[in-house]
Amino acid sequence: MKNHTFKYLIIIIFLFLSCQESINKTRTTNITEEEKLLAKFEPEDGKCILFAGQELEAIGGLEKWNDGYYDHFDAPGGFTMYTDFSPGDTMFGYVLKGLDGVFSTDRWGDYPSNMSLQLEDEDFNNSALAIGLWLVNHEKEVADGIQDKLINRMGEWLKSLGRRPVFLRIGYEFGGGWNHYNREDYIRAYRRIKDKFDAMGVVNVAYVWQSHGWDEPMEMLESWYPGDEYVDWCGYSFFSRWDETNMIEFARKRGKPVFIAEASPTISTPTVKTNGKTKETIFSNPEQAKEAWEKWFVPFFNTINDNPDVVKAVSYINCNWKSHPMWFDNPTFQDVDARLQTSDFISKKWKAETSKELYLKASPDLFDKLWGEEK
């Protein structure tokens, strides 16, 4: 009898331990599955959406604007443009009306912008859209509801784009001194825009919180953060001081993907930290093109390759900066012509690098991939 009791006890203990192991395995599996959940429009690890920007000449692909990125390289996975909620402000003689560059061709010191031309052109049919939304001088008005008409108009327009993924960079480069945003008003404005769009049923937008990318301690980033429920992607700009960023670390801790939302070769001089001055970099100059590749492109691609779990989108600015009035007096961009197509050396290397399976370009199934069931 005692032997039978002992056997039964052993069997009960074995069954109990087996159940516990099964429960633990289930819990581990569930945790693993939760960790693999992707953000809105985030591709799987080891994939990166390639964008090009950031005005009509730089991007090309149109009958009138036909010497830009789309005319010399494979159509990218997305294109980057800009607009604003800053009606009444003047930029280089142009008076902003709000939503400039969305429905009409407008020029505010950069080269002309008009998203409607691109969205109506079949060459752009399979490319996502990234938008830099300027709020400068008006973040409090936006936060207080004074600009709700612009928010509503933009929301209806976004819905009209159907399944085209839109990456909306609200108040991009929020901490840059040149934007002089008020932190509290900026956060309130960011949240109001998203809340309004959510209430309107806008579902084709991923919300990107983008810093300028350098001289940003972790505590500073924390203080400007709108909150996990308001941010789909973290973003930053990749220019001359690319090695100073904390955004990748910040995003990884938050479980957010990273969009390098502005990237163009600018090479530091010894005084870059005091006056922002970068070296002359003109791609049609073979020596300067080689230096740009070694000192900027190599670190740029290394950043992508070294962070496949986080860096999931990048936007190259294919711009002749020095020819735009906006940048004539800007020490960072005034001596830069970063158009890839003006250098055979850089063009070949760019094509070789971006032809790797890592990069997502325009394709008939790109939107389906970005709209995956788990997103």
What are these regions, as identified by a protein language model?
Residues 3-11:
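Sec-dependent signal peptide recognition
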Residues 17-18:
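C-terminal motif of bacterial Sec signal peptides marking the signal peptidase cleavage site
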Residues 46-57, 166, 269, 274-375:
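Substrate-binding cleft of secreted/luminal carbohydrate-active enzymes
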Residues 49-160, 296, 321-346, 354:
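N-terminal carbohydrate-binding/catalytic regions of secreted carbohydrate-active enzymes
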Residues 53-56, 82-86, 134-136, 171-173, ...:
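Active-site beta-loop-alpha junctions enriched in small/polar residues
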Residues 78-80, 126-130, 165-169, 204-208, ...:
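Structural preference for beta-strand elements that scaffold enzyme active sites
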Residues 103-120, 125-127, 233-272:
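Glycoside hydrolase catalytic-domain groove-lining segments
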Residues 141-231, 240-253, 323-354:
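Active-site cleft segment of glycoside hydrolase catalytic domains centered on the general acid/base Glu
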